[in-house]
A protein has these predicted regions:
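C-terminal catalytic domain of Rieske-type non-heme iron oxygenases
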Residues: 1-176
Length: 176
């Protein structure tokens, strides 16, 4: 089953209907047909928005219907310059209790595109857009003359909080 694919059929707005509610209704119909779940009780935000939560220290989840993604970053042995990046898709159980078929683990080869993983649907190319940034980010982090990282006040506040929490664990302020 595909995670998500763009549908070519046009969405028609009813008189007085907003584009947002029309897209949410469209998603409810598409996902009902592909997952056998009645999504009528879900809000428009749950059907459209890309809500993201990061769980300390390396786990990001999008608890939404349209993008049921989970990212997990893990150490790659003892190499601080590399890591393992996992992407999971978590689909809901059908209304009759039938569970989605479990996916087989697939490991990309070096330089293999995420877009080549058909199960990711339209999300493979989205991940591919972000991956080329990682080596430049890593290189920039290592190149600082002041040997520290300057973080933005708002956009990178979660990174700052993550490292402050790590420092507290290392200092023994939090139980392990």
């Amino acid at each position: 089953r595909l995670a998500f694919s763009f549908v070519n059929d046009a969405i028609q707005l009813a008189e007085g209907q907003t584009a947002r509610s029309a897209i949410a209704d469209h998603n409810r119909r598409v996902w009902k047909s592909t997952h056998n779940v009645d999504f009528s009780r879900y809000s428009d935000a749950e059907m459209i928005d890309q809500i993201e939560y990061t769980v300390f220290p390396n786990f990001t989840v999008w608890p939404t219907i349209v993008a049921p993604l989970v990212y997990r970053f893990r150490p790659h042995g003892d190499d601080p310059a590399s890591s393992l990046f996992e992407v999971w898709m978590l689909f809901p159980a059908a209304d009759d209790g039938t569970q989605p078929e479990a996916a087989l683990e697939y490991r990309l080869k070096t330089n293999e595109a995420w877009a080549s993983v058909k199960e990711l649907g339209a999300y493979g190319p989205v991940i591919d857009q972000d991956i080329p940034n990682l080596p430049r980010i890593q290189k920039g982090l290592m190149a600082s003359r002041k040997k520290t990282v300057s973080l933005g006040n708002y956009q990178e506040s979660r990174i700052r909080a993550l490292h402050e929490t790590l420092d507290r664990y290392i200092a023994g302020e939090y139980p392990i």
